Amino acid sequence: MPWPTHPYLRTPEGWLYLAVIIDLFSRYVVGWAVSPIIDRHLVLKALEMALKHRGHADGRMFHSDRGSQYASEDHRDALVASGIACSMSRRGNCHDNAVSESWFSTLKFELGDTFVSHAEAERLLFEYIEVDFNQKRMHSTLDYVSPAEFERNAAEKLSKAEAA
């Protein structure tokens, strides 16, 4: 299942950039990172978190826009080393990354896009992603359960099928 990714958050200290990796199967945010600099280190940090959550990812696909941070040699090499295929949106077509774009739109609607400080933004993002979104947010595409519950249910079904 593809992992789409990315927004820009404003603070008096300057911009803060957020890279997010969403598992399209469950809508679970498996990796994320923030930084005052949008570069390959930001997306590599998010990828590292995703791999810690999911382990080696043979057969998985990573989908992003065509930003230089995603096109960097370091990022492409990290994907290859992890068994992940790289997919990039067509130039100028935001619909190719619709899940990610929708996620960021919801985030900005619910949290806003201006924060008092980088520290406040990071704290609120942690709470939003790890506590609210992954654990509590119900999704119509998941039969109105949270990403965490959807994954638990899927694992239970798989376990029962393997035992049969």
What are these regions (language model features)?
Residues 1-164:
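Charged DNA-binding/catalytic regions of mobile-element recombinases
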